[in-house]
């Protein structure tokens, strides 16, 4: 839950590394200063006392800090980090660089008259805030001090209410940077009401060289559509002249006569003081003895020699790995090995005119393999691809064993010159994504759409239930669903797929997939299951019927109120389900009246059932097929979309967070194999 780091980790895997590190520490020890890092991903009762809660602020059951009760007025709450944070050095007089990232949410319940907002502040350690100076004073100021603080103070405010006495008169709600005053030193317009209840991710950074204090922010769902509204702000200020060397960091939020709820979801901070580099090194050179210089030279030469040997061994291992991969693949039945030369010829040297699409893993090209007289799609993985050697080998091993009419057929592979290529059958009608959201002239008729839904369900039934092992696809989305000449489904891209025994419930894999299609429990815990694949299947069904993307971050009509386009597709469809407006408001407008209402209702309700926030409430793929064939009735879903709660278990670490080989792998777009 909390990561807290001081620069004291001096361990190494070899004696030589230890020697070099010890020498470096010896040389630069006089100039080492405090360095601090922490990361709160949630806030809970009973946590170590690293956060102090004041006023009405309390840690809530959902892991957030609730600064005030939304049902009461004139409340103020604040939190502070319990330890002092050094922001400039008494020895050098120089300020530190620091960066803090946090996420928060404001529920502006009274859109016509908001509360007063939330702010991040820096103040002297132990400074006593005025007792309950609520409302626009944010518990930081009092009227008797002429809108100034009784102690040095710098704060960044997300102000939801315009106070005529001190707030700018040319904008309403705003983001401001304030220097010891309620009057913002610099500010920019910010429409608080249009972002109500959306999660905001903000970052505040200070550059000690340029003296620039900058703020950036972005929202998860609602985009900034007002041209007068910015998403960044900066102000030049020398913190070493304004604040003491040690300060406390914190957040404060207030509501006046209007109710407004403020929540802090996460908080991360890193701070380090720079050394006095130029003068230090001059003194250092003078102070080093001749023997120390010789020793350092020897260590550098030795390090270069060892590094060269390691590079040579790495190259030898790469060659051995390539040979090993080839042997593994050659043992697999079905797909055959092609030479790189043949693929270069088939794709006209991977000509841009042959390119069918490009994604995070690389590019896909149309090719003509004269050797087998077949048109193919050649998937060429890029050198810095997220889909590296392991995923390449994984995709070949899994898909080479699968045989089903609704799966893309893998014809062959190539692993030469450190290049990884997969050769698939060319699917002439491209991806479902290109038909629903692209610029193809021909509209998908309703019969074809329903056929696509059944075909995808058939492919998923084979993967989950009918093959020897359960195959978790983990990346079911419209751009991975190919359509042949008769618009039969061909599910492809098995680079993220995983095998597991049928009796197992889930498989912890690390996060991978595409936002908008990933189940909430999978995003939160990284645990893939049949149910997480079913969730993705449900999203695709909703896209098929509505002709809308799973996530659309646009806003219509420039209105101050939240529009439908600011919601995810699941939220919108479920809301219309509750209003009993599925058929009248959800079906793709391009279809007009040319669709089967019973089938449309079937796919929409089934899509919501599959995309239920609670994984235990989703159907199996067998149940889904029975519903699509009208062998089972439609489920009776809640009129309002349920909210599932997930507890994230975190541990304390003594080093900076890192991502291992099973880390995050997410994409925002796919590729289409075909035209």
UniProtKB/Swiss-Prot annotation:
Database matches in InterPro entries: ConA-like_dom_sf, Kinase-like_dom_sf, L-type_Lectin-RKs, Legume_lectin_dom, Prot_kinase_dom, Protein_kinase_ATP_BS, Ser/Thr_kinase_AS
Main location: membrane
Localization (cell): Cell membrane
Catalytically driven reaction(s): L-seryl-[protein] + ATP = O-phospho-L-seryl-[protein] + ADP + H(+); L-threonyl-[protein] + ATP = O-phospho-L-threonyl-[protein] + ADP + H(+)
Uses in industry and biotechnology: Confers enhanced resistance to late blight mediated by the pathogenic oomycetes Phytophthora infestans and Phytophthora capsici when transfected into Nicotiana benthamiana. This resistance is associated with a high induction of protease inhibitor genes.
PROSITE patterns given in the database record: PROTEIN_KINASE_ATP, PROTEIN_KINASE_DOM, PROTEIN_KINASE_ST
One family name in Pfam for this protein: Pkinase
Annotated knockout phenotype: Increased susceptibility to the oomycetes Phytophthora brassicae and Phytophthora capsici associated with reduced expression of some defense genes (e.g. PR1, PDF1.2, CYP71B15 and CYP81F2). However, normal defense responses to the fungal pathogen Alternaria brassicicola and to the bacterial pathogen Pseudomonas syringae. Susceptibility to P.brassicae and P.capsici is enhanced in plants impaired in LECRK91 and LECRK92.
Transmembrane segments: 282-302
Cellular component, GO, one term: plasma membrane
GO biological process: defense response to oomycetes; pathogen-associated molecular pattern receptor signaling pathway; plant-type hypersensitive response; positive regulation of defense response to bacterium; protein phosphorylation; systemic acquired resistance, salicylic acid mediated signaling pathway
Region spans: Legume-lectin like: 36-269
Residues binding ATP: 356-364, 379
Family: In the C-terminal section; belongs to the protein kinase superfamily. Ser/Thr protein kinase family. In the N-terminal section; belongs to the leguminous lectin family.
Function: Promotes hydrogen peroxide H(2)O(2) production and cell death. Involved in resistance response to the pathogenic oomycetes Phytophthora infestans and Phytophthora capsici.
Protein name as it appears in the record: L-type lectin-domain containing receptor kinase IX.2
Lineage, highest ranks first: Eukaryota, Viridiplantae, Streptophyta, Embryophyta, Tracheophyta
Gene designation: LECRK92
